[in-house]
Regions:
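Membrane-interface micro-motifs in multi-pass membrane enzymes
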Residues: 125-175, 201, 323-351
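Transmembrane-helix motifs of polytopic, lipid-linked glycan transferases
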Residues: 100-124, 166
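Individual alpha-helical transmembrane segments in multi-pass integral membrane proteins
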Residues: 66, 90-106, 133, 137, ...
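Start-transfer (signal-anchor) and selected internal transmembrane alpha helices
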Residues: 1-22
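Membrane-interfacial segments
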Residues: 114-122, 175-179, 222, 305, ...
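Hydrophobic cores of alpha-helical transmembrane segments in multi-pass inner/ER membrane proteins
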Residues: 102-108, 161-173, 207-215, 284-296, ...
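Transmembrane catalytic cores of multi-pass membrane glycosyltransferases
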Residues: 27-89, 93-96, 151, 198, ...
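Short hydrophobic alpha-helices at membrane interfaces in multi-pass membrane enzymes
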Residues: 173-195, 231
Length: 351
């Protein structure tokens, strides 16, 4: 496509994206809390109605998170946010706005860092690719209800996935920054965000840890030195993630599972289930949209400074990293997980 055609197609894509999101937001006014929304939000709801003090609600939400840590699940930051769900303040519809906004902005942000900062694509090319990518991410979501409308389940996966994209954007920004002040600011924000993500779901938790580890090894091979910030973040992330995994509540919860595969079986099961999911999720609409994107992506890749002397190794690493997101549920339950979990897989497979 020439520049004029690309401009027209990009404009149409942006219009379609906006039009497609409007009804998704509109129906949020009819939502109400459901299931675990009540379990996690009851105490905060009580405090809010008694005091109308937001700081008191924050303290109560943390108390709920710590109670859950010792009795049911160790995902401390997720439980904290679950307890603070908008429904306790009478604004349950706000959850849909937060979830869609976070998914859209995080995807645009990471693609901006990749296309504009790393690949040096034009602004128009970036808008074209990122808009279609966001459109596919939203419209090809595995379970819409679990992704945008049930706060407890959606926040646990969609929001933490979005946080992971923001963290990736920050880490790229750190590498590209030459200002010590900016590096310190980005580094601090990255550490805080990594601690929050580590206290979220185990699907994103394991996958993000694997990506960080792979990034460190690749940067060591390319730059001939260890990336100190990345190692620091992975270390802090690992400690925080272990704090979540080793929670007493997880042991109580695991007792409810009658049987599960061992680590080795779960590893190969995760790889198998990743291919199984891809075979079920990729459809003709996605293929056509990827074909539409391919000329722009090929142009960006061919003009970049990045070289892939071992493409098969690159594919192997990519498949392994993608499969790492399937490991948590394969090991814990021997399945791909419910719809809210599979939303993560549907977001990721586009990358």
């Amino acid at each position: 496509m020439n520049k004029k055609q690309l401009k027209i197609v990009t404009g149409v894509a942006i219009a379609v994206l906006i039009i497609s999101i409007i009804p998704m937001l509109w129906i949020s006014q009819y939502l109400h809390p459901f299931a675990d929304d009540y379990v996690f939000g009851a105490e905060v709801y009580k405090i809010w109605n008694e005091t109308h003090s937001f700081p008191a609600c924050v303290q109560t939400a943390w108390n709920v998170a710590m109670t859950m840590y010792h009795t049911w699940q160790g995902t401390y930051s997720a439980c904290f946010l679950m307890a603070l769900q908008p429904g306790v303040f009478g604004q349950y519809w706000l959850g849909t706005f937060i979830l869609i906004f976070s998914l859209v902005t995080s995807t645009y942000t990471l693609l901006y860092m990749v296309m504009r900062k790393l690949l040096h694509s034009s602004r128009l090319e970036y808008l074209f690719v990122s808009t279609l990518f966001v459109l596919m991410t939203i419209q090809f979501t595995w379970s819409y209800y679990d992704a945008f409308y049930w706060y407890n389940g959606a926040m646990y996966y969609t929001l933490f996935y979005s946080m992971s994209l923001f963290l990736a954007s920050l880490l790229i920004g750190y590498q590209l920054s030459s200002s010590k002040f900016k590096k310190a600011l980005i580094g601090g924000a990255s550490i805080v965000l990594s601690i929050i993500i580590a206290g979220g779901n185990f699907v994103s938790g394991l996958g993000m840890g694997a990506i960080l580890f792979a990034a460190i090894l690749i940067m060591k091979m390319e730059q001939r030195k260890w990336p100190r910030l990345y190692i620091t973040i992975l270390t802090i992330y690992g400690i925080a993630f272990l704090f979540s995994v080793l929670a007493p509540g997880n042991a109580f919860r695991q007792v409810t599972i009658e049987s599960k595969p061992n680590v080795v079986v779960a590893f190969f099961m995760a790889i198998g289930k990743s291919f199984e999911f891809l075979s079920e999720s990729i459809n003709i609409a996605q293929i056509l949209m990827l074909m539409l994107l391919s000329p722009t992506l090929v142009k960006a890749a061919s003009s970049s400074r990045f070289k892939f002397s071992h493409p098969w190794l690159c594919i192997l690493i990519t498949v392994t990293l993608y499969s790492s997101f399937f490991f948590a549920h394969s090991y814990a339950m021997g399945t791909r997980g419910p719809g809210r979990v599979q939303n993560i897989y549907s977001y990721l497979h586009l990358w």
